[in-house]
Amino acid sequence: MENSVTQDGIATVLANQSLDSSSVRPEIVVQVVDLKPAGNRYTFSANDGKMKIKAMLPATLTSDIISGKIQNLGLIRLLEYTVNDIPGKSEEKYMLITKCEAVASALDSEIKAEIKASTGIMLKPKHEFVAKSASQIINEQRGNAAPAARMAMTRRVHPLVSLNPYQGSWTIKVRVTNKGVMRTYKNARGEGCVFNVELTDEEGTQIQATMFNAAARKFYDRFEMGKVYYISRGSLKLANKQFKTVQNDYEMTLNENSEVEEASNEEMFTPETKFNFVPIDELGTYVNQKDLIDVIGVVQSVSPTMSIRRKNDNEMIPKRDITLADETKKTVVVSLWNDLATGIGQELLDMADNHPVIAIKSLKVGAFQGVSLSTISRSNVVINPNSPEATKLKSWYDAEGKETSMSAIGSGMSSSANNGSRSMYSDRVFLSHITSNPSLGEEKPVFFSTRAYISFIKPDQTMWYRACKTCNKKVTEAMDSGYWCESCQKKDQECSLRYIMAVKVSDSTGETWLSAFNDEAEKIIGCTADDLNDLKSEEGEVNEFQTKLKEATWSSHLFRISVSQQEYNSEKRQRITVRGVSPIDFAAETRLLLQDISKNKTSQ
């Protein structure tokens, strides 16, 4: 009996697909066939011995597959699922499974023979559910169920992870974990208002819901922070990655016909906080991006509370800095603001000597000191979380981490961050992006990062100028001897040489000329302008000056550049200036590529 599938189970499911998509369907046992990964989920064919149907498991069950609990050719019982059309193929269906349990491990082969009725398993649902909208659920709990609620018999509450744009009606039970302000907008179609809320269900899954105009005015006062609601009659679409604030592929829109009812007079729930941790050594790719990140680390130090004056209203707000480290042997400074600085920040200061592990959700990544993290209004800090990641991190720190030499993640990026407000690992573009957009930098300079090779350095160009040793400004030869600095209004007997040169760079998409000044040019050439001038003055069979320039070519660098417009003979031209130069960190480059691949997979 245990090694049997439900006879005609798939046919039964398909025969009842006209039921409301949120209805409780019969539990059936199927065989898992052709199990394979698809992004962060797994797909397979559900087999009942006679028929097959394509199916998808949620990401929450990936751990069961990795551990071997769910196996290819094994049997599973489908507890909660929906049947949907494959877009563009109305004749084909697929099952989106939200809850299942393993029945048997892998069988010797795929079940193909027709199964006798006596061996089938047709399980009835364990519970009977009453079909109802959000308002009807509340009315029933208050003892005044509407007639429509008594007529329908199968509606249930959906977990957020099960929602998709192809479903019909659904009802969710969620807590408001963040509420935005009412904003106004103006476009070609007129004026309007909009606001957003972030909703979290009992499993910790989050989704952003947006309301416009009439819906915004209707629900703005109804939604209150921290309260739990039943919501139905909304719509879903793919989330706009540029504006989304939570980890969900979809976003929700509520209109004036949507139903939102507070779940009062019943047992409440506290959502489980789900984290998607980013290792500290990978934070550079998120600098000044819209993405909010989660981080976990061991507390290295905690500063006293300081007061910072806010620019927009001159109000003094509390701030506290903490330094975190993780197994990548990198550290990062996290700024706690407002109540987090004075509340949980004080707790961390009191226990700093014990080096607790903390997990922080929803952090903004900035470019101060190369890379830094800051809390925002929706940030959540958990001290010594009960999680495998925290246990592993604490064990590493106690065993070896506390004796390990650490370095700040932003130490190699600070110069670039100070000259363009971004790190070397954000705003990465190919040269063709710049050369094919001649209008870049018309209004103000724009900044990019690019990886390119030095392909040519013109040897007969003016590569340096005479500079004052005090202020680095240009000097002129004095009438009698020495050099005169107009800026310092003084004469010196000696001056220094400082680079001002042009270099041609190339990548796989094209080439262009960059202007490089002293500090950046020294990193490119590998010596000071004074040293290069000495080589140029030397005589001998080997031209050391030319050799030095050749050594500098066909070497790869990470460049932080600014693009501006310069007028020459009444014609505007692009001027591309080097603001920072760094050697290639191949480990960081590999992580960047892997992250891009992961993002592309997620978007597909």
Curated annotation (Swiss-Prot):
Keyword rRNA processing: no
CDD domains on file: RPA1_DBD_A (cd04474), RPA1_DBD_B (cd04475), RPA1_DBD_C (cd04476)
Signal peptide interval: none
UniProt entry keywords in alphabetical sequence: DNA damage, DNA recombination, DNA repair, DNA replication, DNA-binding, Metal-binding, Nucleus, Zinc, Zinc-finger
GO cellular component, as recorded: nucleus
Record note on disruption phenotype: No visible phenotype under normal growth conditions, but mutant plants have increased sensitivity to genotoxic stresses and agents that damage DNA bases (UV and methyl methanesulfonate, MMS).
ZnF region ranges: C4-type: 468-488
Subcellular locations according to the entry: Nucleus
Alphabetized InterPro entries for the sequence: Euk_RPA1_DBD_C, NA-bd_OB-fold, Rep_factor-A_C, Rep_factor-A_N, REPA_OB_2, Rfa1, RFA1B/D_OB_1st
The protein's assembly and partners: Heterotrimer of RPA1, RPA2 and RPA3 (canonical replication protein A complex).
Family designation: Belongs to the replication factor A protein 1 family.
Protein name: Replication protein A 70 kDa DNA-binding subunit B
Organism: Arabidopsis thaliana (Mouse-ear cress)
